A protein has these predicted regions:
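Amphipathic coiled-coil/heptad-repeat helices and related helical stalk/stem segments
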Residues: 4-6, 36, 81
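Distinct, well-ordered alpha-helical segments
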Residues: 1-13
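Substrate-binding cleft of secreted/luminal carbohydrate-active enzymes
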Residues: 15-33, 42, 50-119
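Amphipathic alpha-helical interface segments
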Residues: 39
Length: 119
């Protein structure tokens, strides 16, 4: 089974969509940011030529992440952004989407800009 089918019971090969925006929440599966590449590669293969925009889950209170057990405070901290973006690109993602952009702090945006080549 694909990650999508195994993890969230989604059978993409049966969908008629223009693009995919999977929520690649590495922390939910106790994986580091490079896991995004592994799952994105499979998503690209499953998508049958349609674009995949790898969804990155952003930690909104990243300075207190280590002491918080709430899964809603999971996600990428600024220092992990570059590894996740690079892994998704190398795996064939057409782009990146952010869940949730409102969680992005100045530090997240600075690292994101570097990761996509704006700085």
């Amino acid at each position: 089974k694909s990650y999508a089918e195994w993890m969230v019971r989604q059978q993409w090969q049966k969908w008629n969509v223009d693009a995919y925006f999977p929520m690649n929440y590495n922390d939910f599966y106790l994986r580091g940011p490079k896991w995004v590449g592994r799952v994105t590669r499979e998503e690209v293969e499953t998508a049958g030529g349609k674009p995949v925009y790898s969804g990155l889950f952003i930690c909104h209170d990243w300075e207190n992440k280590r002491g918080d057990i709430d899964p809603e405070n999971s996600g990428l901290v600024p220092s992990e952004i570059a590894a996740a973006v690079q892994a998704a690109r190398e795996a064939g993602a057409a782009g990146i989407c952010l869940f949730c952009p409102s969680h992005m702090t100045e530090a997240h945006w600075a690292e994101f800009d570097k990761a996509i080549g704006l700085k």
